A protein has these predicted regions:
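Catalytic cysteine-centered active loop of the rhodanese-like fold, especially the PTP/DSP P-loop
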Residues: 63-109
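Alpha-helical scaffolding within the catalytic cores
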Residues: 57-62
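Glycine-rich, charge-decorated loop segments at or immediately adjacent to ligand/cofactor-binding or catalytic sites
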Residues: 109-115
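Short active-site oxyanion
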Residues: 27-33, 48-49, 71, 96-97
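Short, hinge-like loop/turn segments at secondary-structure boundaries
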Residues: 51, 69, 115-119
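Short loop/helix-cap segments at secondary-structure boundaries that form the rim of catalytic
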Residues: 42-48, 108
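Flexible, polar/low-complexity N-terminal or interdomain linker segments that lie immediately upstream
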Residues: 1-41, 117-136
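A conditional alpha-helix N-cap/helix-loop micro-motif detector
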Residues: 13, 52-55
Length: 136
């Protein structure tokens, strides 16, 4: 594999906080953002519009509201956390499109982006795609 192939492959499966923020700012995200941390961590602050679905709860039944064509961007606490990787593996096993947001919540805060504090999680019955603008 040459350098071009390597970096193109990385971009196929990774995004960063800046790109996600710009997509949200422009109103054009074509993916669902999943915060795969605990409900407590999510409630303390998360990426605006993100849905809380801890990585261990990523199963087909919990994704039924989203068409198979929907892509997901997952994040966890940050580079010290492998929750986003675990979530990406689960989504990929379910043949779902997925990218990991590099930096996670630590990167989001480092970049100075705003946090949302409202609760919107699978446990509270908000896993219906309504916050994403993507048709269910």
């Amino acid at each position: 594999m040459n350098a071009l192939e390597h970096f193109e492959k990385l971009l196929e499966f990774e995004t960063d906080c800046w790109d996600v923020h710009e997509d949200l700012r422009s109103g054009k995200p074509d993916y669902v953002i999943l915060d795969v941390r605990s409900p407590e961590a999510y409630g303390a602050g998360h990426v605006p519009g993100a849905i809380n679905l801890p990585h261990g709860r990523i199963v087909e039944g919990n994704l039924a509201a989203f068409p198979a064509s929907v892509a997901f961007v997952v994040y966890c606490s940050g580079p010290h956390c492998n929750g986003a990787d675990k979530a990406a593996v689960r989504l990929a096993r379910l043949n779902r499109k997925v990218k990991k947001m590099l930096g996670g919540m630590a990167g989001w805060k480092w970049d100075g982006f705003e946090l949302e504090l409202e609760v919107g999680s699978h446990e509270t019955g908000n896993l219906d795609g309504s916050k994403t603008g993507i048709p269910a």
